[in-house]
Amino acid sequence: MDRPTTYPMDQPAGFRDAQGRHGGVVLPARPEPIALDPATTFLIVVDVQNAYASPGGYLDRAGFDVSGTGPVIARIARAVAAARAAGIPVLWFQNGWDPAYVEAGGPGSPNWHKSNALKTMRRNPEANTQLLAKGSWDYALVDALTPEPGDIVMGKPRYSGFYNTPLDSTLRARGVTTLVFTGIATNVCVESTLRDGFHREYFGIVLADATHQAGPESLHRAALANIETFFGWVSDVAAFESALGVPSRAPAGADLAG
């Protein structure tokens, strides 16, 4: 019986081909560096919608603090620019449902009971058709981030981007092995999608300073700890830019801690 292939512990993590070769870009990360090939990598921007990032959006109306999203959006823009410069495709997710909320599920769905957007609308019927409804301001991406021709924009009806979407087939058709995550919320849709990717054999990397949590900042830290311990790797935007050989677009004196 053939023994499984093993690699020296001082080599970076990451996908290797049949000859044991890893991607040529090595990204500093926790718990160890990870190698990637831009040709088999996607940048995933999760749910940077008015609902999750803007005053007056769903999270704000449901009582969550969105005051810290501005700097995160700026760092997401840097990650997107770096990916484009390196030839890495960008995929934008938008979470939400049809205006009649059929896609959200009725009382027979746990989503009906757990979705804070749906609960907020039940408490405030005047918000019906406003929160996370396709075509609404709430559903739209924030003005500061704009998909470009060649990007992929994909809707999703649940926290994980793999659930009831063509994400997996889209990635496999392109030979993708590695997913770099940014977006909102670290502890909900980002972590859910990265976890599902792990179970489908994708290498998942989250750029910590280009994500924002729903809830207290401790949930952001806990999600990152969970990811780096069990499901993936944690890096930051400056390291991503540097590894790709892309000039940093950080403003002078910016705090790049992740």
Curated annotation (Swiss-Prot):
It comes from the Bacteria. GO terms for biological process: nitrogen utilization; uracil catabolic process. GO terms for molecular function: hydrolase activity, acting on carbon-nitrogen (but not peptide) bonds, in linear amides. The active site is at residues 47, 156, 189. The keyword Hydrolase applies. Pfam families: Isochorismatase. It catalyses: (Z)-3-ureidoacrylate + H2O + H(+) = (Z)-3-aminoacrylate + NH4(+) + CO2; (Z)-3-ureidoacrylate + H2O = (Z)-3-aminoacrylate + carbamate + H(+); (Z)-2-methylureidoacrylate + H2O + H(+) = (Z)-2-methylaminoacrylate + NH4(+) + CO2. The keyword Hydrolase applies. Keywords: Hydrolase. Residues 1-23 are annotated as: Disordered. Its EC number is 3.5.1.110. InterPro entries: Isochorismatase-like_dom, Isochorismatase-like_hydrls, Isochorismatase-like_sf, RutB. Hydrolyzes ureidoacrylate to form aminoacrylate and carbamate. The carbamate hydrolyzes spontaneously, thereby releasing one of the nitrogen atoms of the pyrimidine ring as ammonia and one of its carbon atoms as CO2. PANTHER family: ISOCHORISMATASE-LIKE DOMAIN-CONTAINING PROTEIN, PEROXYUREIDOACRYLATE/UREIDOACRYLATE AMIDOHYDROLASE-RELATED. Belongs to the isochorismatase family. RutB subfamily. This is Ureidoacrylate amidohydrolase RutB. The gene is rutB.
